[in-house]
A protein has these predicted regions:
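Non-catalytic, surface beta->alpha helical segment in thiol-disulfide oxidoreductase systems
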Residues: 85-120
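Thiol/disulfide oxidoreductase modules built on the thioredoxin-like
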Residues: 71-79
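Thiol-based oxidoreductase modules, predominantly thioredoxin-like and allied folds used
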Residues: 47-68
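Eukaryote-biased feature marking scaffold/signaling PDZ-domain proteins and nuclear chromatin regulators
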Residues: 18-21, 26, 62, 66, ...
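Alpha-helical interaction elements in eukaryotic regulators
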Residues: 8, 30-33, 37, 63, ...
Length: 122
């Protein structure tokens, strides 16, 4: 039986703010787009924190639903992954790819003194 009064000390916004990394990626461990987003960030040498919403404490149904609902309110999307640079939503994997191509990713990362590898800067 699930306790509907269950309250985690952390919301999605708190998880982002408390991250030691400038980039936070909300993910599902089995999701191919989530895996692709992780690979893209690794290839770009971007430090990031992954919050897997289907593992550990985040599997608890009430907490999971609350975090997913909050992410949807923050981003306007109910899909994963969701990438944040600082507190700014970049979006999902295809949005992150587009941000790389149009220079938005570079601009957001520069605020954290992160430089993309040569040849990928726009």
């Amino acid at each position: 039986m699930t306790d509907n009064n269950y309250r985690s000390p952390q919301s999605a916004q708190q998880l982002i703010a408390a991250s030691a990394q400038p980039v936070t990626l909300f993910s599902l461990s089995w999701c191919s787009y989530c895996h692709a987003a992780k690979q893209l960030l690794k290839q770009l040498n971007v430090p990031f924190r992954v919050v897997e919403l289907d593992t550990g404490e985040y599997r608890e149904p009430v907490l999971n639903q609350r975090l997913r609902k909050e992410l949807q309110q923050m981003t306007g999307s109910n899909t994963l992954p969701q990438v944040f640079i600082g507190t700014e939503s970049v979006g999902g994997y295809t949005d992150t790819q587009a941000a790389l191509k149009n220079g938005r990713l570079k601009k957001l990362l520069e605020a954290f003194e992160i430089t993309l590898p040569a040849g990928l800067n726009r």
